[in-house]
């Protein structure tokens, strides 16, 4: 990662202008922007252009979201009211299960994660966390058995 890039920052939105532009209510804007499945599209694009100054992955199934200006691959993840997970997306959801080897393989293929606290919308703080940081958290037991942690735990780890 380029040293001139900040490791933290804040993405800001004007809720009223977004609501007006989309012709929806302010409440609907808040609901949309605090749903990680929905807002990820927008977060990936803003992080790509404003923070990593790179390009988006060629496809949704690429295994990463952004290629930075140095060629490093990054995942963008939302810290929602339900927390955040670090395992590959194919391990998350109904009927799917965590697999340690796939998790560690994923970490070997990316530079790390950009974690966005969507619960703080309209000013969403983000943190750039390297894969080696995640591996350290894993080995110290901070990520539990399936690499999903609560929002509170994520914010505590990020504040260290």
Model-derived segments and spans:
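Nucleic-acid endonuclease domains
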Residues: 1-160
């Amino acid at each position: 990662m380029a040293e001139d890039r900040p490791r933290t920052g804040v993405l800001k939105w004007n809720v009223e202008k977004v609501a007006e532009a989309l012709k929806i209510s302010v409440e609907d804007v808040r609901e949309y922007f605090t749903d990680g499945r929905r807002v990820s599209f927008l977060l990936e694009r803003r992080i790509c252009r404003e923070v990593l100054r790179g390009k988006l992955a060629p496809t949704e199934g690429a295994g990463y979201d952004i290629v930075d200006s140095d060629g490093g691959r990054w995942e963008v993840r939302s810290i929602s009211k339900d927390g955040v997970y670090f395992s590959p997306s194919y391990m998350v959801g109904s009927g799917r299960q965590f697999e340690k080897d796939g998790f560690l393989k994923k970490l070997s293929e990316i530079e790390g994660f950009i974690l966005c606290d969507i619960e703080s919308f309209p000013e969403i703080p983000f943190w750039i966390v390297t894969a080696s940081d995640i591996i350290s958290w894993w080995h110290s037991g901070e990520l539990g058995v399936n690499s999903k942690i609560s929002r509170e735990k994520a914010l505590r780890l990020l504040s260290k």
